[in-house]
């Protein structure tokens, strides 16, 4: 939380809104591989290495959360070709192989299209101010606002549930309404929320 606010306070808004938000580049291992289980092996072993189905499932869950932040934080989401298709690979040259035409992860591609549409539908996400509302214990909530639009981004990377204020949920993953109307984020859940009460307190406890 403090790191985000330090960036927001030390860069002009015009600059912050144009920074390139990368998860992967041609000079780094594929983000899906980074988010999988650690592997130390020879260059030949890394060339042949692919995640097990269980490892890949975990890495994909982490990537969905990371991409959600990539599209909701200030800056321009920049996607390295193939990351949206689920490509794996260690450092150069393994991160630069051909795009997997006809073998893409279509579910992941659809998710990236949905994130792009979500950002495109919200001026607050594209150009809004950033304010960190709560951070700690594996949880973070921040708002993006401009003009009359204000949205709250919440990510739960803790081991327990996180109860959030009631409101309109514009996007959610691993979330459910409570009997009293609040939004409950499960472990690994995240959402884009418009709280019914703009002054509602968000606790990380």
Language-model regions, residue ranges each:
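Hydrophobic, well-ordered secondary-structure elements that form the walls
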Residues: 70, 82, 115, 154-156, ...
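Residues that flank catalytic or metal-binding motifs in active/ligand-binding sites
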Residues: 95, 111, 138
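C-terminal beta-strand-rich structural cap/linker in extracellular carbohydrate-active enzymes
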Residues: 180-205
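Conserved alpha/beta catalytic core and glycan-binding cleft of carbohydrate-active enzymes
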Residues: 1-92, 157-158
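Acyl/amide activation-and-transfer machinery of modular secondary-metabolite enzymes
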Residues: 92-100
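Carbohydrate-binding surface patches
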Residues: 133-166
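Aromatic- and carboxylate-lined catalytic core of secreted/periplasmic carbohydrate-active enzymes
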Residues: 11, 99-132
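Solvent-exposed beta-hairpin/edge-strand motifs
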Residues: 167-176
């Amino acid at each position: 939380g403090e790191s985000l606010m330090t960036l927001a306070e030390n860069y002009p808004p015009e600059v912050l809104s144009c920074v390139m938000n990368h998860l992967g580049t041609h000079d780094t291992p594929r983000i899906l591989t980074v988010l999988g289980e650690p592997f130390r092996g020879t260059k030949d072993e890394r060339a042949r290495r692919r995640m097990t189905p269980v490892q890949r499932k975990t890495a994909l869950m982490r990537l969905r959360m990371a991409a959600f932040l990539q599209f909701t934080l200030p800056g321009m989401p920049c996607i390295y070709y193939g990351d949206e298709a689920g490509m794996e690979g260690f450092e150069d040259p393994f991160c630069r192989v051909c795009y997997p035409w006809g073998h893409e992860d279509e579910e992941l591609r659809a998710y990236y299209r949905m994130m792009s549409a979500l950002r495109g539908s919200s001026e607050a996400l594209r150009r809004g101010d950033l304010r960190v509302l709560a951070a700690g214990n594996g949880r973070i909530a921040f708002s993006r606002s401009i003009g009359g639009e204000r949205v709250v981004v919440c990510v739960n990377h803790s081991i327990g549930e996180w109860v959030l204020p009631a409101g309109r949920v514009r996007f959610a993953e691993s979330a459910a309404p409570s009997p009293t109307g609040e939004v409950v984020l499960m472990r690994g859940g995240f959402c884009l929320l418009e709280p019914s009460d703009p002054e509602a307190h968000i606790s990380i406890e």
